[in-house]
Amino acid sequence: MREVKAIVDSGNYDVIWTHGPVMSVVTRIAAREARRQGSKVWYLAHGFHFFSGAPLINWILYYPIEYIMSRYVDMLMTINEEDYTRALKFKARNVRKIHGIGLDVKKFMDHILSVDFYKKLRKSIGISDDDVMILSVGELKIHKNQKVIIKAIAKCNLDNQHYVVCGKGPDKTKLELLASSLNIRQKVHFVGFRKDIPDLCRVADIFVHPSVREGLGIAPLEAMASGLPLISSTVGGI
C-alpha cells in the first residue's frame, strides 16, 4: 500500500488506471488524496469473481468489496454484459462496457497448413493422424479448470484421445500429478506457452474451454474462427 501510494502521490497523474479485484482495491485506497488533487481513477474489471453460478464464497467475499469500493472510482469499465448490468447498481457514477476486444479472424479462418506440416506438428506433440486431439489454451490456474477435462479423458477411457494443454502457470505440477494418478499421463500433453496457436487450432479436432470464471474469453473466439468444434463452460463473457 505504501509503495503504491508513494508512486501515485509523486506522479501528478491525469489518470490512474487499475486492474484486478485485489490490486484495484489497493490502488483506489492509495489514490484517495490524488483524486482530491484532480487525478482520475479508472478501474477495468476483467470479470467479477461473483457471477451467475459462482460459488457462494465468491459472493460473500468479493461482492461487498466491489460494491463499497465502486464509489472510489471515476470510471468503472466492464467487458461483458453480466458484469455491466450488475455494475450499474454499484456506487460508481460512470460505468462503461467495452463491447469487445479485437480479433483478427482472418489470421485463423484463412490459415491453411500443408499435409506435411500438419503431420509434422502433430507428431512433434506425440499425436498420430488417427488420434483425436483435444486442445485448450490458457494459464494453468485453478479458475481455468483444466482438471475437469483431464478427469473426463480418464472417464471416457478411449485409447485415441489426447489432451493438449497450452499455457503455463502455478498449477502445472498439480495437473501433471492428477493425470498420472488417473493413469492417463501419456494422453495429456503439456506444451507450455506457444506462439503458434493458429497452427495448433488447425491440427486439433476439438477445442475445450472449461473456465469457472472468465471476463471475456479470447481463446474460444480464436477456436471458433478456426472452425473448431467448441466445448465450453457458460460463465462471464463466454
Label each PLM-derived region with a short phrase.
Residues 132-155, 170-176:
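A conserved mid-protein helix/loop that constitutes part of the nucleotide-sugar donor-binding site
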Residues 217-220, 238:
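Short glycine/serine-rich donor-binding loops of glycosyltransferases
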Residues 176-192:
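Nucleotide-activated donor-binding/catalytic signature segment of Leloir-type glycosyltransferases, i.e.
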Residues 2, 40, 50-72:
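Nucleotide-sugar donor phosphate/pyrophosphate-binding loop at the beta->alpha transition
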Residues 193, 212:
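Aromatic "clamp/platform" in nucleotide-sugar-dependent glycosyltransferases that forms part
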Residues 18-24, 45:
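Short His-centered aromatic/hydrophobic patch
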Residues 229-232:
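Short hydrophobic beta-strand element within catalytic cores of glycosyltransferases
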Residues 67-118:
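Donor nucleotide-sugar binding/catalytic pocket of nucleotide-sugar-dependent glycosyltransferases
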